[in-house]
Amino acid sequence: MFLLRILITGGLGFVGSHLIDSLVKKHHKIRIITKSLSKINNIKKSKKQVQIEKINIINFNKLGKSIEQFRPDVIIHLAGNTSHSKSFENPIMDVESNCKSTLFILEKIRELPYPCKFILGSTFIVVGRPKKLPINEKTPCNPTTIYGTNRLASEYFCKIYNQVYGLDTRIFRITNSYGPREQIVSNKNAVNFL
């Protein structure tokens, strides 16, 4: 018997794949939404215990049908653009993958006839350049990139849907994560420092 039905967007990525490995051990029923199977080896230990559906998160029709069919108790939204440079090269795509996808999922949850928790994977980049260090959750946000601005907008959507509609929304800001399965990106600070 499964404990929770958990739908994870971006479940084959660095953070998502480690989360999948942990959740599978706890016997949750998991569905991964991914736009590409290129990182399938990230979950080689767990892939027989999860459902994988190839859907681009900006295909809202297919994403909505998958949510309705799976009937999740929890949606963990980790998918989206994570590149600052790509957000400047194609800002419209960044809005689609980071901002509109979050809003679509929240709206879909609002329409469901049962409660569903929403967890947003955000980033410390929403803070921008802080006036003092160290930063904490109360540090004012002043993003300096398109990516950071879209992620902050997604956080605000979560807060609004919680306050106005009573949705159970949570936000966690991922900060300089690194480790096995990480995609090597030339301008990522933590990896370059190490």
Language-model regions: role of each:
Residues 47-59:
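Rossmann-fold cofactor-recognition segment
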Residues 28-38:
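Conserved glycine-rich Rossmann-like NAD(P)H-binding loop of the short-chain dehydrogenase/reductase
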Residues 77, 103-146:
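Conserved Rossmann-fold NAD(P)-dependent oxidoreductase catalytic core, especially the SDR/UDP-sugar
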Residues 132-133, 156-194:
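NAD(P)-dependent short-chain dehydrogenase/reductase
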Residues 6-26:
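N-terminal Rossmann NAD(P)H-binding glycine-rich loop of SDR-like oxidoreductase domains
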Residues 57-97:
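NAD(P)H-binding glycine-rich loop region in Rossmannoid oxidoreductase-like domains
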Residues 9, 33, 75-79, 118-124, ...:
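SDR active-site strand-loop-helix element
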Residues 146, 150-153:
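Active-site helix of classical SDR
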